[in-house]
Amino acid sequence: SPDGEYAEETGLEKEQIVVLRRAFDSFDRDKKGYISPETVSDILRMMGIKVSSTSFKQIIEEIDEDGSGQIEFSEFLQLAAKFLIEEDEEAMMKELKEAFRLYDKEGNGYITTQTLKEILHELDARLTAEELVGIIEEIDEDGSGTVDFDEFMAMMTG
C-alpha cells in the first residue's frame, strides 16, 4: 500500500498517515492533489503543533521540492514527520531526564555505575551480569565509576 511506503520513507506510524491523509483530503476539496502552504500551517495548528513563521517558511522551501508553491501529499507528509517525530524525541528526552533525576538523589549530576546496572536490569531483565559489565564499560569510558547525564543519554538514544 502507498501508506506503507510512506511509513518507511517518513518514519511515521501508519495511523498517523491515515489521519494526515484525511486532513489533506478535506482541505484539497477540488482533489487537485496539492494544498497551499497556508493550509498546511492551518493543519499543523489544528494538530497542536506550534511553529514560528520563519522556520515554517524555511521548511516549506525545503519540502516544496519542485518549487511549485503547492504542497503535494508526499511533501506534506515529510513536513508533518519533521514535527511529529521531533516531538517524540523531545518527550523521550524529558522522560530520560526524569529517570536520571530520580536516581541522582543527591542531585550531583551523575549516577554510579551500580545504580545504572539496576536501571538497565529493570529495563531488560534478560541481561546477564557479563552483558551488564560490558555495557557499563562502554559507557563509563573514563572508568570513573560514575555516569553523567550526557553519557546516560548517549547510551539510551544510541
From Swiss-Prot:
CDD domains: EFh
Transmembrane segments: none
Pfam families: EF-hand_7 (PF13499)
Entry binding sites for Ca(2+) 1: 64, 66, 68, 70, 75
Keyword Chloroplast set for record: no
Sequence positions bearing N-acetylserine: 1
Native species: Balanus nubilus (Giant acorn barnacle)
GO cellular component terms listed in the entry, alphabetical order: myosin II complex
Signal peptide from the UniProt entry: none
Entry keyword Aminoacyl-tRNA synthetase: no
Note: There are two different troponin C in barnacle. This protein binds two calcium ions.
Function: Troponin is the central regulatory protein of striated muscle contraction. Tn consists of three components: Tn-I which is the inhibitor of actomyosin ATPase, Tn-T which contains the binding site for tropomyosin and Tn-C. The binding of calcium to Tn-C abolishes the inhibitory action of Tn on actin filaments.
UniProt entry keywords in alphabetical sequence: Acetylation, Calcium, Metal-binding, Muscle protein, Repeat
The name this protein goes by in its record: Troponin C, isoform 1
GO molecular function: calcium ion binding
Binding site for Ca(2+) 2: 140, 142, 144, 146, 151
Similarity field: Belongs to the troponin C family.
